[in-house]
Amino acid sequence: MIKNFVKHFLGSIRCHLNGIECSRVVYIGKNVRVVNGKNVTLVKNVSIRPDCDLFAGTKMFIGDYCDLGTRNRFTGNIIIENSVLIGPDNYIASVDHCYEDISKPVMNQGVYSPHNNGHQELRIGEGSWIGTHVSIVGDVHIGKHCVIAANTVVTRDVPDYCVVAGVPARMIKKYNIETKEWEKLK
């Protein structure tokens, strides 16, 4: 009980030091780096495990009861809805690197928002689970209660109640609301 109090107290201090807008009961682990903290909102019972990077664009919102695993990097305009579980070692970015000018190194060309899917942000729907070593890049919307399998690369929208896997991501299961079962797709 004392350990939890100390963890959440330190989380509140880390929020304040980084300019993050956060509710009560927020845990922010060691070595979490935040850029543009004033654009980050953490709602209640959020856990950000150690060694994560939050590089906020104009808006980064993390909903109630979210758990972000260790060594994750979040970049750009991102909305994570309530009760999302994100495993370790993921790259989640609404932006991509510019590379058009061959006279400059890519690292000196900045970033852009690809808008391949017609959205203004990357969104992860309520109750979803993102496995480990996943890359989600662009203005992707992941639906509610989705599972993104380990080692998957997502660059397109994922509908509600789906399991996706692979490079590039493809739907392998979908929840059938009528039969109340997960069905494999061919």
Where are these regions (language model features)?
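Extended, small-residue-rich solenoid/repeat segments and analogous flexible loops
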Residues: M1-T41, N45
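A general secondary-structure boundary signal
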Residues: R24-V25, D64, G69, D160-Y161
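Flexible, glycine/small-residue-enriched loop-and-beta-strand segment within the central core
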Residues: V35-L42, S47-G138, V167-P168, K174-N176
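Glycine-centered loop/turn positions within well-structured domains
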Residues: M60, T152, D160-C162, R170
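Short helix N-cap motif at coil->helix boundaries in the Bergerat
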Residues: R156
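Conserved beta-strand-loop-alpha-helix hinge in the C-terminal portion
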Residues: C162-V164, P168-K184
